[in-house]
Structure formats: C-alpha cells, structure tokens
Curated annotation (Swiss-Prot):
Primary site of residence: plastid
UniProt record similarity statement: Belongs to the RuBisCO large chain family. Type I subfamily.
Keywords on record: Acetylation, Calvin cycle, Carbon dioxide fixation, Chloroplast, Disulfide bond, Lyase, Magnesium, Metal-binding, Methylation, Monooxygenase, Oxidoreductase, Photorespiration, Photosynthesis, Plastid
Protein's name according to its UniProt entry: Ribulose bisphosphate carboxylase large chain
Active site: 175 (proton acceptor), 294 (proton acceptor)
GO molecular function, one term: ribulose-bisphosphate carboxylase activity
Species assigned in the record: Rubia tinctorum (Madder)
GO biological process: photorespiration; reductive pentose-phosphate cycle
Stored PROSITE patterns: RUBISCO_LARGE (PS00157)
Length: 453
C-alpha cells in the first residue's frame, strides 16, 4: 500500500508547496478598466526573488494558498485570481520594490469597503515571506465606484446648506477634551461660535463618559448653536460625536441630533469601523445631516514608511464609505505631513478626476465619476500665524480647525475665535487682491491685528 502522504497522478494535481510566481506573476497581463489596481511597497526576506514576492502578495490577497488544493479544479482561477503584473525598484532602497497587483472586480462585494479591505489587506500583511508590506495606493474602477453612495451631501450641498461661499470654513475643537461638564462645554461652544467660527467640535474620544453623558452634551451644544445663530445671523454647527459601542447606539444618537435640528454629527471612522460608518452616512443622507469624520487611530496604520497603508488609501475608502469632512493633516502644524503628498490625497478627496502623479504619491489615475467630494480638515497645532500658509495650501474648499489656537487666546475663547475669523478674512481678501500669501503673510496678519483682539 502506498503511503498516505503520496498523491497519485490520476488525482489531477500535485500536492506540496508551490512557487507563487508560476501562477500569479503575469507580466504580460493587460489591466482591464474593471480591475481594482493596487501598488504595494514590498520589503521581503533575503533570498526571495522579486517575482516570487510580488506573486505571493497577489496570491495571498486573492485566491491563493500555500499549496495546490483539489477544489482549484472546481472554479476558474484565471477569472478570479489576483495578478502581479509589474514590478519596479524603489530608488535608494535595495530590499524594496513596488509590486502592482490587479484584482478582478468579481472578488468584491458591491458597496462594501469592509469587504474590499478584508480581501486586499486582511491576511497578506502577516505573511512570513515578507519582512514588511505597505499598500501605497488603489485604483478604484468606475464600475465599483458606482456601487457606493459616498459622502452624504458633498462640498457644494454643504455650502448651500450653510450659505457660506468663497472662503475656507473655520472650526475649533473644544478643550480640554475630557473632564468638562456638559453645561461648561456648551458655554465654550457658544463663545467660539459667537466669536465668528462656523463650527466647533467634539474631540474624538468624547463619547458618553461619566463626567458628561452624550444626551446632556447634545442638549447644551444645541442651545449654544441656536443662541449664536440668533445673535450672528449665520448658520452654525457643532460636530456632535455619535460614535458609540454599537451601531444601534450610534444611530440612536444621530436620531436625537436630527430631532434637535442641528446640522452636523461626527464619527470616528477607523475605530468605529467602515460598516458602522457607511450605515451612519446612509442615515445622514436620508435625514439631512452633514457628517464630519475623524481619523483617530490612522497613525497606527499609516505612520510607518514601509508597513501598513498610506493615508491616501484610507482617504479614498472614506470617500466611498461616506463622510462630508475628514481630517487630512496640516503640513504646517504639529503632526506629520509632506506638502506635495498631502495635497495629493487632498485632491483625491475633493476632485472628480485626478491624474497619476508620482511626485505627489498618486500611483494611478482615479475617476470618481461625480461621487460627491469631501472637505479636507486641517487641524492640530495651528494658530493665526499659520493662516496665510493654510489659506494658500488648502484653498477655499477646506475646514481650518483651531483648538488651542482659539481657546488658548489670552483674552478668552470668544476673542480667540474673533482673531481666527479676522485673520482668515484678511488672508482671503489679500489673496483675492493678488497679494502673495507666502511672501506677505506676516504683514497681512499684522495689519489685521488692529481689527482683532
């Protein structure tokens, strides 16, 4: 009797470990308009050829496993497998290269960012043949984009709702982020909105803690919104964080916000999850609420240069899942952000069509086919002296959000808000008159000081 470990030729396949490149490395493949394309930065273990590494990524993120299985014969692998179709070296990095992988669209559930990420990045990042792996970019085909509803409203609808045009919007995160009572929290909201800001914001970790339950916060913030609107004649908002421990509780909070007739709610989309985020986006679209998105936990995923995912991928995913604002870095504040790279994914959030531009980190041309745009939010570590640079870098379709840069004003919250509004309007006016904000920014702010506390 032959050993049980042997496989007879009549079975139709040979068991054992198989080189991935024999099946999944296809340099002759011409990508289809319907393929999802991915650019991976691969850092492999020594001694493994690049073709095998790239093929391994394609296999383990699609139909492959470590051996041939008999059920391979029951389907069409050529139809469903991912393909590594191109490999290019990374300049200055001997052990790294970019592997381009094409995935057939049939591998993905329609309208599900969750399923897309589960397939592409859910398993392969723990593959021991790779020392590190980073997803640099995705090309989402038009056929897949059209299965998503995207942002609840988008940039133009938001401006129409707020009746605010021709300038960036101004926001402020209430500080201290934790510990205030609901009434004192609402007072700070009122002072900032009354001083000239368009929005105030819950911090990402303000949910419903013992010192301030969510319902109390919502009520006092709504009162602050109504009062400031009545006194200024402008539409105001506060990002009421609806993030919760369950989707049901999250929706309950959003329903209460709608009953209070406030304009906007907020979600922590990475910690909350893409399924929850898409559910909330659908509710906001159906009920006239704007949706502000915070990216809490993003640096766990995107901070390392050779492992994880670049934020441009998370930004694309958010535009598909749904959100009207998302934090996008500042370039000039206290958090990391290279100018050209940051502007690359800012354009991916706002524009309908973006050409491939490797100098800005954009690996693929992306056509959003009129999926609504997302306002990038510049936040953290910024103040009025950054206003000229922020106005020049981000342009009008953005939210400039100052926390300590408002509440840290020596005369108080309202004067801090006035200072921000005066600085912004001075910069916009100077820009419209043809002045160079990069050259004259300091003078513009100094000239504006006489109109501001």
């Amino acid at each position: 009797m032959s050993p049980q470990t042997e496989t007879k030729a009549s079975v139709g396949f040979k068991a054992g470990v198989k080189e991935y490149k024999l099946t999944y490395y296809t340099p002759e493949y011409e990508t289809k308009d319907t393929d999802i394309l991915a650019a991976f930065r691969v850092t492999a273990q020594p001694g493994v050829p690049p073709e095998e590494r790239g093929a391994a990524v394609a296999a383990e993120s699609s139909t492959g496993t470590w051996t041939t299985v008999w059920t391979d014969g029951l389907t069409s692998l050529d139809r469903y497998k991912g393909r590594c179709y191109h490999i290019e070296p990374v300049p200055g990095e001997e052990e790294q290269f970019i592997a381009y992988v094409a995935y057939p669209l049939d591998l993905f559930e329609e309208g599900s960012v969750t399923n897309m990420f589960t397939s592409i990045v859910g398993n392969v990042f723990g593959f021991k043949a790779l020392r590190a792996l980073r997803l640099e970019d995705l090309r989402i085909p038009v056929a897949y984009v059209k299965t998503f509803q995207g942002p609840p409203h988008g940039i133009q609808v938001e401006r129409d709702k707020l009746n605010k045009y021709g300038r960036p919007l101004l926001g402020c995160t209430i500080k201290p982020k934790l510990g205030l009572s609901a009434k004192n929290y609402g007072r700070a909201v009122y002072e900032c909105l009354r001083g000239g800001l368009d929005f105030t914001k819950d911090d990402e970790n303000v949910n419903s803690q013992p010192f301030m339950r969510w319902r109390d916060r919502f009520l006092f913030c709504a009162e602050a919104i109504y009062k400031s609107q009545a006194e200024t004649g402008e539409i105001k908002g506060h990002y009421l964080n609806a993030t919760a421990g369950t989707c049901e509780e999250m929706i309950k909070r959003a329903v209460f916000a709608r009953e209070l007739a406030v304009p906007i709610v907020m979600h922590d989309y990475i910690t909350g999850g893409f399924t929850a985020n898409t559910s909330l986006a659908h509710y906001c679209r159906d009920n006239g609420l704007l949706l502000h998105i915070h990216r809490a936990m993003h640096a766990v995923i995107d901070r390392q240069k050779n492992h994880g995912m670049h934020f441009r991928v998370l930004a694309k995913a958010l535009r598909m899942s749904g959100g009207d604002h998302i934090h996008a870095g500042t370039v000039v504040g206290k958090l990391e952000g290279e100018r050209d790279i940051t502007l690359g994914f800012v354009d991916l959030l706002r524009d309908d069509y973006i050409e491939k531009d490797r100098s800005r980190g954009i690996y693929f041309t992306q056509d959003w086919v009129s999926l609504p745009g997302v306002l990038p939010v510049a936040s953290r570590g910024i103040h009025v002296w950054h206003m000229p640079a922020l106005t020049e870098i981000f342009g009008d379709d953005s939210v400039l959000q100052f926390g300590g840069g408002t509440l840290g004003h020596p005369w108080g919250n309202a004067p801090g808000a006035v200072a921000n509004r005066v600085a912004l309007e001075a910069c916009v006016k100077a820009r419209n008159e043809g002045r160079d904000l990069a050259v004259d920014g300091g003078d513009i702010i100094r000239e504006a000081c006489k109109w501001s506390p």
